[in-house]
Amino acid sequence: KNLTNDTGNSSYIYRLPGVFGKWCKPNYNSVVATFCHNISHDLPIQVNDPSFELSLVYIDDVIEEFVKVIQGERGGEKVPSVQPEYKIKLGDLSTQIQNFKESRDSLITEKVGSGIVRKLYSTYLSYLSPAQFAYSIPSYGDERGMFAEMLKTKDSGQFSFFTAGPGITRGGHYHHSKTEKFLVVQGEARFGFRHVASGETHEIITTSKKLKIVETVPGWSHDITNIGTKDMIAMLWANEIFNPDNPDTITHKV
């Protein structure tokens, strides 16, 4: 205050809550850094009071605020704060970071696109060693080709891909409520459709040289045939995670 009064220079006083983000030293004075480091390296963590509420700000938001000061976007003597400031219980924090780790096995991603979960996930990944940058996923193969699930979401379905050799047809079923989007990324394919009530048929030809999304529609049986001379590769999104107890997949010839 005296500096501002005596010289006219601007001054800013920040009282920061817990700051988290990449490169923070673990097992020192940041619970986020400690949890991210220890959980990612299969080391134990200690939660004394799961109900204790933390106040946190993200390092990128701190830097953005400080840059505004340096560039003169704030004037006069102030006691500003960094926003957004997040509130999270200690138990919820440990559970969230543990879920990040487990998502590689379940393939079910957390909602990492916005808010504190986005920033915690980026922070968690920054504590992985290079040997942990990649992980394997299951694949399933038969005479038709192979199939692998890549990513599952809690509320927006799942992503997978499959292959088929020349002349191979996959599918031959319909769904009551499940919907799908197909994208052929290598080769050529013919999609066949038949309305299960009226018998109406339809056909779509796609190729990786001219990318096209093909949607399956409830009540229409469908199949996909590789009409090219090399293996076909197709991406597949379904609006729900596959449930073997309720697959919503009924065999029906196209």
Regions found by a protein language model. Name each.
Residues 177-196:
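Glycine- and acidic-residue-biased ligand/ion/polar-headgroup-sensing regions
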Residues 131-172:
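A short glycine-rich, His/Asp/Glu-containing loop-to-beta-strand
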Residues 13, 24-34, 51-71, 91, ...:
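Substrate-positioning beta->alpha
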Residues 197-200, 221, 225-254:
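Double-stranded beta-helix
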Residues 195-225:
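Short acidic-glycine-tyrosine-enriched beta hairpin
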Residues 68-139:
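Mid/C-terminal beta-alpha module of Rossmann-like enzyme folds, strongest
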Residues 156, 168-181, 208-210:
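A short beta-loop-beta micro-motif enriched in histidine and acidic residues
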Residues 2-23, 36-37, 43-52:
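Conserved beta-loop-beta element that borders a ligand/cofactor-binding pocket
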